[in-house]
From Swiss-Prot:
PROSITE patterns: G_PROTEIN_RECEP_F1_1, G_PROTEIN_RECEP_F1_2. This is Envelope glycoprotein US27. The keyword Membrane applies. Keywords: G-protein coupled receptor, Glycoprotein, Host cell membrane, Host membrane, Membrane, Receptor, Transducer, Transmembrane, Transmembrane helix, Viral envelope protein, Virion. One of its GO terms (cellular component) is viral envelope.
């Protein structure tokens, strides 16, 4: 009985060590005290960029919105939840110290893992949608529509909430640590299962699927199409590379932690590496959520134009512009001329366009 009790105690200590370094609310709160200005600055920048993406899609692209736009919009929503969630949860912890740590523990884990799995689903569907447009073209236009994309989005959010449920329902704040509460029968293998699930479903599987679709699209464009779709591939390549790079330290730490749990060793050097990788990985995940819209701005030409147009429209709404009475006729004539030129240009582009009308997506 003594040996069994000692073994169970050792297993629970190992589980506590794992969960202590997975979004440890106490240690994150201590870091927040030193980097409070930087966290709020990144929150403001990330909120502005993600809201700009969402506004551009919902306002500027509302009439010609494509399934890709729907996935990008929800990806921005997932990033926005991560960006806004962290500083507000930590501010709540500062002003409500009695109940705050329990809320921070569950809240940060919920935002982090739900948005992680939801963002992965949206990235995969975004790559698959681009693959269908480039490789299959008009053959899948009946299947590929906004109603189906909206249904997929709802399914993905529900699936992300279910997949992330063990990460925030089974964690609680105990002895100033955010630890997992597992039964004795599952305390040995369930943390390893959670880490492996994140490694496979949240990192390896998306990279393999996105790399496969990207490879097929590149080969198809080089052999059969032309270079007008290369802008889309540039954006997708940057998105895939940034996803793999920013999430690598976090998933590496989970993988090393699973190995340490299975082997049962207590190596201080390995534990230090795991802790460092987890902190770096969580920081990079927050940075990526803030700067992910910048990828579309820097690489996507059409995205940059649409976002700039949205900014100008809202700037004109905020600043009242008055046209003198004698210039109204002149302005109307100029507007009629611009509309006529735009109609002729649109007719010419549709006639000589290298791709079917309606295939130019928000991502280009």
């Amino acid at each position: 009985m003594t040996t069994s009790t000692t073994t169970t105690t050792n297993i629970m200590l190992q589980v506590s060590n794992v969960t202590n370094h997975t979004l440890n609310s106490t240690e994150i709160y201590q870091l927040f005290e030193y980097t409070r200005f930087g966290v709020w600055l990144m929150c403001i920048v990330g909120t502005f960029l993600n809201m700009l993406v969402i506004t551009t899609i919902l306002y500027y692209r509302r009439k010609k919105k494509s399934p890709s736009d729907t996935y990008i919009c929800n990806l921005a929503v997932a990033d926005l939840l991560i960006v806004v969630g962290l500083p507000f949860f930590l501010e709540y912890a500062k002003h409500h110290p009695k109940l705050s740590r329990e809320v921070v523990c569950s809240g940060l884990n919920a935002c982090f893992y739900i948005c992680l799995f939801a963002g992965v689903c949206f990235l995969i569907n975004l790559s698959m949608d681009r693959y269908c447009v480039i490789v299959w073209g008009v053959e899948l236009n009946r299947v590929r529509n906004n109603k189906r994309a909206t249904c997929w989005v709802v399914i993905f959010w529900i699936l992300a909430a279910l997949m992330g449920m063990p990460h925030y329902l089974m964690y609680s704040h105990t002895n100033n640590e955010c630890v997992g509460e597992f039964a004795n029968e599952t305390s040995g293998w369930f943390p390893v299962f959670l880490n492996t699930k994140v490694n496979i479903c949240g990192y390896l599987a998306p990279i393999v699927l996105m790399a496969y679709t990207y490879n097929r699209m590149v080969r198809f464009i080089i052999n059969y199409v032309g270079k007008w779709h290369m802008q889309t591939l540039h954006v997708l390549l940057v998105v895939v590379v940034s996803f793999a790079s920013f999430w690598f330290p976090f998933n590496l730490a989970l993988f090393l932690e699973s190995i340490r749990l299975l082997s049962g060793t207590q190596n201080e050097t390995l534990q230090t590496v795991i802790t460092f990788c987890l902190y770096v990985g969580q920081f990079l995940a927050y940075v990526r959520a803030c700067l992910n819209p910048g990828i579309y701005i820097l690489v996507g030409t059409q995205m940059r134009k649409d976002m700039w147009t949205t900014l100008r429209v809202f700037a004109c709404c905020c600043v009242k512009q008055e046209i003198p009475y004698q210039d109204i006729d002149i302005e109307l004539q100029k507007d009629i001329q611009r509309r006529a030129k735009h109609t002729k240009r649109t007719h010419y582009d549709r006639k000589h366009a290298p791709m079917e009308s309606g295939e130019e997506e928000f991502l280009l």
